Amino acid sequence: MTNMRKSHPLIKMVNHSFIDLPTPSNISAWWNFGSLLGVCLMLQIITGLFLAMHYTADTLTAFSSXTHICRDVNYGWLIRYAHANGASVFFIFLYLHIGRGIYYGSYQFKETWNIGVILLLMVMGTAFMGYVLPWGQMSFWGATVITNLLSAIPYMGPTLVEWIWGGFSVDKATLTRFFAFHFILPFIITAMVMIHLLFLHETGSNNPSGLNSDSDKIPFHPYYSIKDILGLMFMLLLLLTLVLFSPDLLGDPDNYTPANPLNTPPHIKPEWYFLFAYAILRSIPNKLGGVLALALSILILMLFPIMHVSKQRSMSFRPFSQCLLWTLVANLIILTWIGGQPVEHPFIIIGQLASISYFCIILILMPTSSFMENKMLKW
């Protein structure tokens, strides 16, 4: 009799994806982040569901409902902070996952990569709308500033902004619709993750060497399931340390003040994981130019498969490209720092230089270094 996991229509799909999946024998810990992101997504959906049971999407009661969750609901503080810090951990892993894809040339799986970029945009949108829900000062003003950016779109901009707001300012209608979208998007993201995996399993995983590994595959379980559990332990350690010791470390103190349309906070800034894009937005004096640069700072990821000119897939054996990638990482850290600083000298000029460097490294220097490496190897 055939084993049930190989014959049952449903269990067979799980088997082919997580148990008998042929996996390269040499993939490193950098390949752990995919499964960790899946766990993060599940954790966010579960904690979010419990928060939604106690939350009210109304301008008068949203702030106090969140306070009620922390004070009166059993372990409500734990659920809320696990959800807030879970988002931070989610983004840390997302950025590491993307960085791994760039370093090892995984973007050559074009469908998987492009769906991944769409996933990134969806997760960013979900996180932004989630930040608005507690209805603190930074929630309100963050929503006002970011939605206002759409008014830079020629001809239809102002109408579009009012349509998104559901009125003439960020108000009850905005909060209600943001809650609805924030609730539904993670489930759409889950469906997209399945498509992401479907395309990945069409080609099989990449590996650190960037070479074809069809001749050397091992089953996913038990080898990589155990390896992923180790990564999961580290993730839980990081998350629980944040939640239990310093839950407000990554938050903004202004968000503990209820939203007040008559009082603007001195520095409006998003959560830390959007600061690099926010710095690029602010570094361009023109509104439409800033919005375009903001969009391009993420959408530029879609150009990676087109701009790959190296004869080698991975950067493992390309020292020039490695140096440039780590320069890009340093540049992104500088942008993140600048995004959290006030708009004054010398931060303005540092932000502008870092923004120019960001696009130059990706669009000019990386393809040039790949071309030079090809020449040096006489390819």
From Swiss-Prot:
Domain of life of the organism encoding this protein: Eukaryota
Segments traversing the membrane: 33-53, 77-98, 113-133, 178-198, 226-246, 288-308, 320-340, 347-367
Major location (coarse): mitochondrion
Gene Ontology CC annotation, any one: mitochondrial inner membrane
SUPFAM superfamilies, per the entry: a domain/subunit of cytochrome bc1 complex (Ubiquinol-cytochrome c reductase), Transmembrane di-heme cytochromes
GO biological process assignments: mitochondrial electron transport, ubiquinol to cytochrome c
Residues that bind heme b b562: 83, 182
Keyword ATP-binding appears in the UniProt entry: no
Binding locations of heme b b566: 97, 196
Textual note on the cofactor: Binds 2 heme b groups non-covalently.
Cofactor requirements of the protein: heme b
Membrane topology field: Multi-pass membrane protein
Positions that bind a ubiquinone: 201
GO MF term (any one): metal ion binding
Subcellular location: Mitochondrion inner membrane
Coiled coil: none
Miscellaneous comment in the UniProt entry for this protein: Heme 1 (or BL or b562) is low-potential and absorbs at about 562 nm, and heme 2 (or BH or b566) is high-potential and absorbs at about 566 nm.
Function comment: Component of the ubiquinol-cytochrome c reductase complex (complex III or cytochrome b-c1 complex) that is part of the mitochondrial respiratory chain. The b-c1 complex mediates electron transfer from ubiquinol to cytochrome c. Contributes to the generation of a proton gradient across the mitochondrial membrane that is then used for ATP synthesis.
Protein family: Belongs to the cytochrome b family.
Subunit structure: The cytochrome bc1 complex contains 11 subunits: 3 respiratory subunits (MT-CYB, CYC1 and UQCRFS1), 2 core proteins (UQCRC1 and UQCRC2) and 6 low-molecular weight proteins (UQCRH/QCR6, UQCRB/QCR7, UQCRQ/QCR8, UQCR10/QCR9, UQCR11/QCR10 and a cleavage product of UQCRFS1). This cytochrome bc1 complex then forms a dimer.
Protein name: Cytochrome b
Species the sequence originates in: Isothrix bistriata
